[in-house]
Amino acid sequence: MRLHVGCAMWTHAAWPVAAEPAASRLRAYAGWCDAVEGNTTFYATPSRSTVESWAGQTDPGFRFVVKLPKVITHERRLNGIDEDVRAFLHAIEPLGPRAHALWIQLPAAFAPGDVAALATFLRRLPRTYRYAVEVRHRAFFEEDRSISLLERALGTVEAEWVPFDTTVLFESRPTSDAERDAWTKKPRVPRRTRALTAHPIIRYLGRDDRETTIDGWQPWITTIAQWLREGRSPTVFIHTPDNAQALDLARLFHTHVRTAVPTLTPLPDPPPTEPLTLF
């Protein structure tokens, strides 16, 4: 029984992995967490050689949730993108089993009237991969008809709905520059806890205050524990506005779930941050 946890990136100036050479920071990160969001691919399709280096730094059981490029999802809105999709799939092929899911993050303007285009797009994708869809239009969280419409479209290809839980961020006014920036950029939508598949994916955003972040994820401990008991295999990504503590918090989240589900396989101990010496 495994719960995979990770962060929005594999390096940050405040993390121990930042002390490693740039070419080996992913390997160092994989000693702390066993999943990562592939956000860099949103901005451009990586070279195949770059992806080969990612695969070479991680075990086959490591999970990449790789975001489709914005030219596909945001600029062309899933239309006329065959060549872009083919290029992206070719580039990420070296990940093999590490490509846990391909993540289709859609803009806030993507509304219930666009679901038919999404359904067509999903049906045309190869079944080689799992797919995970993130939406931000409030109708998908507040209108039963819109929720059912999207769930049916995802269900036809066994795709997962990725909730981005930002409720803790918006519970009180921001207190740092990073929180103020997040207030202007992050979606403000209700929390969603329904899994559609055996491989749910959760994105949780806390605050820069550690205890507030921990208090805010308590409902997820209960939900994840129940999913594990049902035989599901979840992946959870922990965010904070500045992400300075996200690496440690991701491991702590795993520990809290393991307290609720003692049979959960523990994460390996992270590598030492300083060389071991006798004196």
Which stretches of residues belong to each language-model region?
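Residues lining hydrophobic/aromatic ligand-binding pockets adjacent to catalytic sites
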Residues: 1-279
